[in-house]
Amino acid sequence: MTILSQVFSIFAKSYWYRKIMKKVIYNKIDKRILSTLPPVNFTGKIIVIQGEQEAEKAVEYLMQQEILGVDTETRPSFSKGVTHKVSLLQVASRDICFLFRLNMIGLPDCLIRLLENNYIPMIGLSWNDDLLALRKRKEFKPGHFIDLQKIVGAIGIEDLSLQKLYANVFGEKISKRQRLSNWDHEVLNDKQKTYAAIDAWACIQLYEEIARLITTNDYHFEMIVESGSI
């Protein structure tokens, strides 16, 4: 049996586990499966922040939340030796995502205060890379950050990308088409805004669901074995 047919067979069985028994979690998701999944539907509110006064109000709201999802975007470089500073900081609650346009406002004191806080868990993915990029704009002491890549192994998941993690846990696909778009553009288009918001918001969804599964053991684990590894 090929790896793809094996995966499709397991996915077919998983329907009944999801409906009748437990959620099915796989050690890894074959990338060819991703195209068969429905897209993520983000219904939350997206607010673009382009001024310091707006940033102050946004941070005031965010500092009252129980949990936050975080991510960054940087304008891609297609020339050797050319790099750009981080363009966008996304910070999401469960139903609102703020897009802070750092290329316009830098890292104001209110954002530093948020990033240094030690009591609101801020969930990210491969967050050390984001922190390095942010600290190139302005130095700060990172607060209470939790990296999803460090906890997914607790339920047997080997994949580390956000797209594959979300597909595994929720059976939906996060599109990555906007990743290499121009994040320094004067006006972000709707597709960019939705993409950026989903990446931060999805971190909360994943963290809370993985924490639930760890606590309740309410899942069925399936091992995908690659061809030639047996």
Which residues make up each language-model segment?
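Conserved DEDDh/DEDDy metal-dependent 3′-5′ exonuclease domain
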Residues: 47-50, 54, 63-67, 76-176, ...
